[in-house]
Design a protein with these regions (language model features):
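Positively charged, proline/Ser/Thr-rich regional signature most characteristic
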Residues: 59-126, 175
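Catalytic cysteine-centered active loop of the rhodanese-like fold, especially the PTP/DSP P-loop
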Residues: 110-165
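Short, solvent-exposed loop/turn and secondary-structure capping segments
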Residues: 81-83, 141-143, 168-169
């Protein structure tokens, strides 16, 4: 299995490549944007204390029947209700937050820390997988970092989120 640093670098490069879709034709500008995305993802991962998974790794774990808690951090009506990774539970977080923000500043809506912990479960050694829409969306970072602060030991973020999941041709569920 890859080291956390290797996994972070690999995921950063993969994730950043998804971000290039909207970049200009100038290869130098594209490289600057790729670098910014890669560094931001690496910094968030390091600051949050969680690990990264690709959608392919998540799908493999799901296919093997591994017991995972999968959390979709996108808004219920606009996203989760329409499509989500099969088996995922929903708890919406905000896109942007700062270190030290309190709970009400990182959660979208009226969800409480107790409700989020109830979704994650009492077993803090069980793998928790958190995703949002795409690499630049910070919702999954906010949720993963919070789960780590609550003592969950195997917290994973899928940076490509539902866009990468669909891009890989994997099935989605809807409410």
């Amino acid at each position: 299995m890859m080291t956390l640093r290797s996994r972070t670098l690999l995921a950063s490069l993969i994730a950043a490549s998804f971000a290039l879709g909207g970049c200009g034709d100038n290869q130098f500008e594209q490289e600057v944007k790729l670098e910014q995305s890669a560094v931001q993802l690496a910094q968030e991962t390091q600051q949050g204390g969680y690990q990264l998974l690709t959608v392919a790794e998540l799908k493999t774990r799901m296919d093997k029947g591994e017991e995972l808690v999968i959390i979709d951090t996108m808004p219920y009506e606009d996203s989760y209700k329409k499509e989500h990774i099969p088996g995922a539970k929903n708890f919406a977080f905000v896109k942007e937050a700062k270190a030290g923000d309190n709970w009400s500043e990182i959660v979208e809506g009226s969800g409480t820390p107790e409700q989020f912990q109830a979704l994650l479960g009492e077993d803090k050694s069980r793998p928790v997988v958190i995703y949002c829409g795409f690499v630049k969306c910070g919702r999954s970072h906010n949720a993963a970092a919070w789960a780590v602060t609550q003592g969950y030991q195997q917290v994973y973020r899928v940076p490509g989120g539902i866009f990468a999941w669909k891009g890989a041709g994997y099935p989605v569920s809807a409410e």
